[in-house]
Amino acid sequence: MTKKLIYGIGYNSKGVHKTIKNGKRTKSYQAWRDMMRRCYDTDFHEIQPTYLGCSVDTRWHDFQSFAEWFYSHPYSDSGYQLDKDILVHGNKVYSPDSCVFIPKQLNVLLNNSRSSRGGLPQGVCWDKQSAKYKAQLSINGRHKNLGLFSNPQDAHTSYKKAKEAYVRDKAIEWRGRIDRSVYHSLMNWQLAT
């Protein structure tokens, strides 16, 4: 009998972990399918090109192996999101060695919005009214202005300092509700330049 492949890669070796319970996909199966989709669905890559080049460790090609990790991992059942690069900055491989669960609020905090900012550095936009570069930080969906600058580098430096402080503040706020490794990673997080 041939295994049904999910996105041409993933399979279920039919172990103890269920894919469906009470007519709905289990949390572990949905997380696994979503991970596979982000890495191997070409239609998804057209919508979210940041996932181009991402892959899944061969150990997790089997749903049973992923589910075993999922249910033994802290915060897997708390509605948190699977993250591959908070512990290993720039990581492109989903694996049991690099993945953790983090709250959505922290996950989106670290997005760089490269596609929406054009050629300017992160946290910088051109302010037509002042004819200067404006540094701004998004806090809870609102922009906090950090100042106006004569060049994009100075604006970005201001943004970098504010963003790193904000990430540390969020780590302190979430301490005790996130894995210790996530807390330490956030406390030491630096914006890539």
Residue positions per predicted region:
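Structured segments of extracytoplasmic/periplasmic soluble domains
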Residues: 38, 69, 162-165, 169
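An aromatic-rich alpha-helical recognition segment common to small helix-rich domains
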Residues: 124, 135, 149-163
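Short, cationic Gly/His-enriched loop motifs
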Residues: 18-41, 46-132, 136-137
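Arg/Lys-rich, low-complexity, intrinsically disordered N-terminal tails that contact nucleic acids
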Residues: 1-25
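A short, exposed loop/beta-hairpin motif centered on an aromatic-Gly-Thr core
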Residues: 54-58, 142-153
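Glycine-centered small-residue hotspots that permit tight backbone geometry or close packing
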Residues: 10, 83-85, 123, 147, ...
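Extended, polar beta-sheet/loop recognition surfaces of beta-rich domains
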Residues: 7-9, 106, 166-193
